[in-house]
């Protein structure tokens, strides 16, 4: 069950006209273009096909341009994922183990890069449509174009111009819902968190992409 916590860090498809698709893409990319960095807390819930809660988690995160991110799950147990834009570290404190691997540039494999990568790459990686628009609250649906993505679809919601939540659905219908809390945009990033030096005695597992 632990692997569910770090899904960074899941309704029938609606058909959109080419004009609507283009508008949604331009609108989302315009929002992402203003984000140089983002940090805050998160609440994460994993749901099965029937909507039953399988797991809940709380933590904090930060992402920044250059494909850099830091994602710390604090409860129910501590796990951390970080990237300096080249390397990813996934650390399990209880197991005293860290997995080290190259960062995949595939946004379908690394959802955190939606906010930390180049906005233009988002349009290349996803088919984008506007799923819901309530004025101050807008939800975009992103469907991966690549092969073997981590998820089948990703809904990202903005409220008052800020990212508010993400909902990922996999091929089995399992959903991961992430609500962002107390966001700070474009300020206050601790760049040292994007690199991880394992504590002495940690088992280091090197993986190739």
UniProtKB/Swiss-Prot annotation:
A single GO cellular-component term on record: outer membrane-bounded periplasmic space
Keyword terms: Chaperone, Periplasm, Protein transport, Signal, Transport
Signal sequence residues: 1-22
UniProt main location, coarse: periplasm
Record-level GO BP terms: lipoprotein localization to outer membrane; lipoprotein transport
Coiled coil residues, start to end: none
Record-linked Pfam families: LolA
Protein's UniProt keywords contain S-adenosyl-L-methionine: no
Subcellular location(s) per record: Periplasm
Top-rank taxon, per record: Bacteria
Transmembrane portions of the chain: none
Biological role: Participates in the translocation of lipoproteins from the inner membrane to the outer membrane. Only forms a complex with a lipoprotein if the residue after the N-terminal Cys is not an aspartate (The Asp acts as a targeting signal to indicate that the lipoprotein should stay in the inner membrane).
Similarity comment: Belongs to the LolA family.
Subunit structure: Monomer.
Xref: NCBIfam families: lolA
Protein's name according to its UniProt entry: Outer-membrane lipoprotein carrier protein
Species of origin: Alcanivorax borkumensis (strain ATCC 700651 / DSM 11573 / NCIMB 13689 / SK2)
Lineage: Bacteria, Pseudomonadati, Pseudomonadota, Gammaproteobacteria, Oceanospirillales
Gene behind the chain: lolA
